[in-house]
Amino acid sequence: MTRQITITRPDDWHLHVRDGDILNDVVPATAACFGRAIIMPNLVPPVTDASAAMAYRDRILAAARGTDFQPLMTLYLTESTTAETIREAKAAGVVAAKLYPAGATTNSASGVTDIRNIYPVLEAMADCGMLLLVHGEVTDSDIDIFDREKVFLERVLAPTLTAFPSLRVVLEHITTAESAEFVRNHQGNNLGATLTPQHLMYNRNHMLVGGIRPHLYCLPILKRNKHQEALREAVASGDPRFFLGTDSAPHAKDKKEAACGCAGCYSAYGAIGLYADIFEELGILDKLEAFASFNGADFYGLPRNTDTVTLVREPWTMPENLPLAGGGIVPLKAGETVNWRLA
């Protein structure tokens, strides 16, 4: 049995770090392992222009406590976003813009109601080389929550890719067999997808059978076992269009364990060990480096990291609770054994 592996330093291509005191509590866990992370812009108020993005970046760097961690900044697309906003953000170093369908997830009320309303913005993004990151769910009240992603593929994503064939798009945190198949069947190299640890480790039975487990509640919601298996097959395939994105989303314990609990799993703490466990279980540890360290950088057109991290197979127990401003936070797989960790 493999006891130690050394890989190129990984990156996290989908991360929430919030703001204020919470930011200071959660950034170090990511900075200890990952070289870079795509920072989600759904603050209150959202990050909608270059100046807000750069100010947010400065706050994250201050919380990284002297590491070489690089936050990669994004804009929150609204129906007031302009092509000039995109060009200014690109010039300032913003690498991507995020499409949140209005009402789809945490702090998405300012999102887009109809993607056609921002077609001029998408054209500007394609022209200047800014990536589009997509929360791939429709929000129509008559669409079942377990079907939102599938409908999005047909109704929104496919027409957008046709309209903008040079726009590079990341379908984030995919949860369905249909999404995995859509990415693998797409003709061209302009569509990629991130996969979270929770969607690879769990399905909706884990969340609902024997009692509701609120710390597994996230959006897009966990799906049937057949979808979990399809996601695992996708990463096992070695297809370079799939890459690591934790979607780590910190919420205080009392905000999760509530009558109307928040969506999101906090997975930044020990994240690379969670992925290593999954890849070991699938018998594909040799593919972890590409998934975690190469595929995302290559898709974004960024250089791969040049330093390395070493993982050792020394089982440890994920803490039941971690300190967080405003109350503790329960990490993904709390109280359970994780086999791999950073050396």
Curated annotation (Swiss-Prot):
Any Pfam family hit: Amidohydro_1
Membrane-spanning parts: none
Positions where N6-carboxylysine occurs in the chain: K98
Classification via Gene3D superfamilies: Metal-dependent hydrolases (3.20.20.140)
GO molecular function term, any single one: zinc ion binding
Organism expressing this protein natively: Marinobacter nauticus (strain ATCC 700491 / DSM 11845 / VT8) (Marinobacter aquaeolei)
List of residues binding Zn(2+) 2: K98, H135, H173
Enzyme Commission numbers on file: 3.5.2.3
Keyword Zinc-finger recorded: no
Name of this protein: Dihydroorotase
Names of the cofactor(s): Zn(2+)
Catalytic activity of the protein: (S)-dihydroorotate + H2O = N-carbamoyl-L-aspartate + H(+)
Top EC group: hydrolase
Described function: Catalyzes the reversible cyclization of carbamoyl aspartate to dihydroorotate.
Subunit structure, interactors included: Homodimer.
Cofactor note: Binds 2 Zn(2+) ions per subunit.
GO BP annotations listed: 'de novo' pyrimidine nucleobase biosynthetic process; 'de novo' UMP biosynthetic process
